[in-house]
Amino acid sequence: MAATAAAAAAAPPADPPDSSPAASSPPRPSPEELVARAVAPVKPAFLRPPLSATPPKDEGKANGGGAVVAEKKSKRQLKRERKQEQKSSSHLCIEVGKSGNVSSCKYGDSCRFSHDIDAYLAQKPADLEGTCPFTNLDQLCPYGLTCRFLGTHKDIHAASGNLSEKHEINALNKDIQKLLWKNKYKFPKASAQIKLLGLKEVIKSKPDAANDDKKVNHDNLDGNDDENKEPLCNPPVNAECDSTLCEELDRSEGEPLIDNSIPCVEPRPTKKSKVESDEIDKHGAGTLNTNTESEDPNLSNGLEPSNNSSSCRTDLITTPHLREKKIIDFREKLYLAPLTTVGNLPFRRLCKTLGADITCGEMAMCTNLLQGQASEWALLRRHSSEDLFGVQICGAYPDTVARTVELVDNECSVDFIDINMGCPIDIVVNKGAGSSLLTKPMRIKSIVQAASTVTEKPLTVKVRTAFFEGRNRADSIVSDIYDWGASAITVHGRSRQQRYSKLADWDYIYQCAQKAPDQLHVVGNGDVFSFTDWNKHVSGCSKISTSMIARGALIKPWIFTEVKEQRHWDITSGERFNILKDFVSFGLEHWGSDSKGVETTRYFLLEWLSYTCRYIPVGLLDVIPQRLNWRPPSYCGRDDLETLMISDSAADWIRISEMLLGKVPEGFTFTPKHKSNAYDRAENG
């Protein structure tokens, strides 16, 4: 022991361990290893230490609000505050604001809003930088004194009759809304077709709608009628079913609330109606005598009679054959997917400027449209630049969907109507709509047959691979859906249960396309994030007409330019900022240039920025193109603006919005509606 200690003491001292960063840190994985682990291979020069994992207390707040939780107010308090706020000087009457003349309001002293112009101008916030979007269009601003760009107006006291020209269509007519509120809008085609298919229509349009013309045109549109308490339409039920099966309706969506103790009976057509349905499948036309006088649908709905000699007759319903319908060629066209919340009209208009060919509105619920809800009808708005435009609807029952299709066909200008049978969110699935229809193929058949025969416009269907993971069902309906009446089908390569936890299954999409008839357009959907992805998926199967672009367009809307020019665009922060400017300009033109319109534009801009922050510039990557499932490391941009744009902090998104729309109101907070940062977990609906 002593000898060992002496030898150790005599030995020279060991070199101290190297404490340099290069020696202490593990070797950096290669780009190939990072890609295999679904980590974005950012160049080492742009990497930086990760920030604190705990978000600051003022995350998503403009002015770093305190820790005190505000007490929740009752509905009575909120209503009282709304009334007081309406009478405040900050809420100037719309008509007075347009013309700058107090006497222009027809309600006079009984108006609910303020008529004090001097008080309004005294408390009005300072004008925003820039010019009024309507001035740039050489048009008079419809917001007059309330515009946040008032100083740039050429004539602030112009007559309201010379206001800006409308570039948007499909607005809800007030007379039509009144008929929908009273459940007096007639659906002759849908009612006849539902009866022809052997499905029972319990609630029908109220009679004597034609005699209510004066009432429709002169009554106030408050919707507080006794008739509005009744449901618009009931689900189709078998004539042999108990009539108490569907007594109650959910007021929020109008769908049936069936007692779980009673088994739900799928509607089955009678033998006679089955023969008639087969005749429709073979010949594309059906005739039904209802022993009622023929009438103009406009006249029956209390409107001006139509001059069209080919108006619909309720005693003779002739359903158009598929060959007689307008044909839309989807082949190799750039299709912007319908996107909830962020797929609004200004965003679609922006994508059109960047190269999109086909656009589709946000998903609208059938029952809400039939009830005349203005917020739902706003989803059907179309801009004049959208030359190939469709609307997407979602419903659970044949009669509801058929009525909605007939309503849209009569009142809106669209090129095609899409039925969403792939929506995965719970509030839709729990009502029997969306992806839950994949478990009911006979219901799908009834919906498509009923809807396709009430319109001459092409009908398309959007589905997922399946409802449950590993139980693919889409291929079982692709071969028949054309015979039922659909012109195209979009297959999203994920199941409802899977959501975004894995990459889209394009092999299964190709399998579905191989089973489709030649006349049916098959559109693929899932994980298209570059022009190479689009080329690969469209050329991977000759029966794939095109590929729908969804999240890829949200993260980088210039993907349409990349596909058309066949290049990876290393876009600069300045070019991206100009795109944001265009969106803000389109938003102010759509939602308004007053204070309310500015804040609405800000909200949708922030929702969109929660997606664009996922984009990694091409010049920062060792491997291109970027993939949707790549998780970005902590990195910085090539300049301060690019670094700000790649931040996933809501406070930084608010800072960007302030660069475009001025300071946010005091106490402003923002929380994204969608979890856009879902990379490998089933979070994002």
UniProtKB/Swiss-Prot annotation:
User: Biased composition, Basic and acidic residues: where in the chain?
Assistant: 209-221, 273-284
**Catalytic activity, as annotated:** 5,6-dihydrouridine(47) in tRNA + NAD(+) = uridine(47) in tRNA + NADH + H(+); 5,6-dihydrouridine(47) in tRNA + NADP(+) = uridine(47) in tRNA + NADPH + H(+); a 5,6-dihydrouridine in mRNA + NAD(+) = a uridine in mRNA + NADH + H(+); a 5,6-dihydrouridine in mRNA + NADP(+) = a uridine in mRNA + NADPH + H(+)
Where are stretches of biased composition, namely Pro residues? 13-29
**Segments forming a coiled coil:** none
Chain positions recorded as FMN binding sites: P338, L339, T340, Q392, K462, H492, N525, G526, D527, A550, R551
Keywords noted in UniProt: Flavoprotein, FMN, Metal-binding, mRNA processing, NAD, NADP, Oxidoreductase, Repeat, tRNA processing, Zinc, Zinc-finger
GO process terms (BP): mRNA processing
Superkingdom in the source lineage? Eukaryota
PROSITE patterns referenced in this protein's UniProt entry, alphabetically: UPF0034, ZF_C3H1
Instruction: Provide ranges: composition bias, Low complexity.
Output: 1-12
- This protein is called tRNA-dihydrouridine(47) synthase [NAD(P)(+)]-like
According to its UniProt entry, this protein's organism is: Oryza sativa subsp. japonica
